[in-house]
Amino acid sequence: MSGSNPKAATAGSQAGPGGLVAGKEEKKKAGGGVLNRLKARRQGPPHTPDDGSGAAVTEQELLALDTIRPEHVLRLNRVTENYLCKPEDNVYSIDFTRFKIRDLETGTVLFEIAKPCISDQDQDAEEESVDVDISVGRFVRYQFTPAFLRLRTVGATVEFTVGDRPVTGFRMIERHYFRERLLKTFDFDFGFCIPSSRNTCEHIYEFPQLSEDVIRLMIENPYETRSDSFYFVDNKLVMHNKADYAYNGGQ
């Protein structure tokens, strides 16, 4: 869920039909678009290796590779401290512009953010001589109430655009940790995105059941719950976003 520059999911394109070919459940959007909903195709059980494809690897080992692939990040056993790719590796100009989290049982919107348009950002930077931080958009910090930890199913809806190149095999692997403990792995396929398209998507997150002791510790230790979101095109890492979480809101 690391998206302030958002994170998420699956959908139709405003540039024409088939902007994303991946949806399993479809629902008409206002305005005639199509919102596709995806559940994770693979969700590794908590506290265990995800795919049995090999021994655990370290962040340093992955940083030494020329190409990082999905099977590599699935073998990480802790959250990363650094980004595993550079912003310029996103040669497809994938840009997340809006992000919303909602409780699927009640429909309550829990979090929503939109990215300012580029022209506004450029004008503000020119007027105020603001230095550009290349990490902006790669990290987001969330604060939720304790009740969030008792939710079972959450929908994360995102809008994103792609540049003038087709995007094939677009996939996100998101791994959530509390301290050194892997809580859950989510693995979503976006599918194919046509060039110069704007897409709207929703990922369905089915959260693990946590013990009361773990819930208490997560509430008492804000921002020690962290996640990595890895984005792949044709099985090559092109984007890496991070997030951390507090669950003591309203206290």
Swiss-Prot record:
Disulfide bridge map: none
Gene Ontology molecular function, alphabetical: lipid binding
Residues binding tetradecanoate: 142
Region (Disordered): 1-56
Keyword ATP-binding in annotation: no
Keywords assigned by UniProt, alphabetized: Acetylation, Cell projection, Cilium, Cilium biogenesis/degradation, Lipid-binding, Protein transport, Transport
Annotated compartments: Cell projection, Cilium
Coiled coil segments of this chain: none
Biased composition (Polar residues): 1-13
Listed GO biological process terms: cilium assembly; lipoprotein transport
N6-acetyllysine modified-residue sites: 24
GO cellular component: ciliary transition zone
Modified positions (N-acetylserine) in chain numbering: 2
InterPro entries: Ig_E-set, PDE6D_unc-119_myristoyl-bd, PDED_dom, PDED_dom_sf
Pfam families xrefs: GMP_PDE_delta
Family: Belongs to the PDE6D/unc-119 family.
Subunit structure of this chain's protein: Found in a complex with ARL3, RP2 and UNC119B; RP2 induces hydrolysis of GTP ARL3 in the complex, leading to the release of UNC119B. Interacts with NPHP3 (when myristoylated). Interacts with CYS1 (when myristoylated). Interacts with MACIR; interaction only takes place when UNC119B is not liganded with myristoylated proteins.
Function: Myristoyl-binding protein that acts as a cargo adapter: specifically binds the myristoyl moiety of a subset of N-terminally myristoylated proteins and is required for their localization. Binds myristoylated NPHP3 and plays a key role in localization of NPHP3 to the primary cilium membrane. Does not bind all myristoylated proteins. Probably plays a role in trafficking proteins in photoreceptor cells.
PANTHER family tied to this protein: PROTEIN UNC-119 HOMOLOG B (PTHR12951:SF3), RETINAL PROTEIN 4 (PTHR12951)
Domains (record comment): Adopts an immunoglobulin-like beta-sandwich fold forming a hydrophobic cavity that capture N-terminally myristoylated target peptides. Phe residues within the hydrophobic beta sandwich are required for myristate binding.
Protein name per UniProt: Protein unc-119 homolog B
Lineage: Eukaryota, Metazoa, Chordata, Craniata, Vertebrata
